[in-house]
Swiss-Prot record:
It holds the Pfam family Pribosyltran. One of its GO terms (biological process) is UMP biosynthetic process. This is Transcriptional regulator GfcR. It comes from the Archaea. Keywords: DNA-binding, Transcription, Transcription regulation. Gene3D superfamilies: 3.40.50.2020. HAMAP family: GfcR.
Amino acid sequence: MKNVDDLIDDAAALADRGLSRGEIADELNVSRETASWLVERADTNASVAATDTDDSPRDVHVDWSTIGEAGARLSAIGIALADALRDHSHDVDLVVGIEKAGVPLATATANELGTDLATYTPRKHQWDEGDMADLGGSFSRNFASVEDRDCFVVDDTVTSGTTITETIQAVREAGGTPVACGVLADKQGLGDVDGTPIEALLQVIRVGSGDD
């Protein structure tokens, strides 16, 4: 079982490979703020015991690698997500996967629904520090266009809601209609984002000291 010191080591290894802090957040299924905190702890060689202060992030790490490493398990999750999303529409003809980890889930979901597939790379993948306002996300030209399509948006984890909100807005700006979102785990307990309902297979709620 991993502890926070293990996550600090993982963040350091990912940073050494040249990943941005936004990409590290995506790999570890934590917020950008948590990813920055982990990298900073690694840079100072500080254990979590030495840095457990009121400034420490309040987050939950979700490790779904046991699912991700096996095609049959991914397919099963795709079936479950597709079943949940069908409650919102049977006429959707496109699934949009959020890069990186959301794409395998979106592929399995699209396969179960018999729809086309699009992918979106959020701006956080370019982020290291400072304001993200000057950065932008993009749809891959190697997959289907979202223009004039009714879409389901699929990701692995909702951490703050920022990435899935960005993707919903990007779909609309590109001429598509986001009908609903499907995620493996929701750490915020969001019922909808920007008017688009969210179906989560798991609701993850942090309970403990430091909660307001």
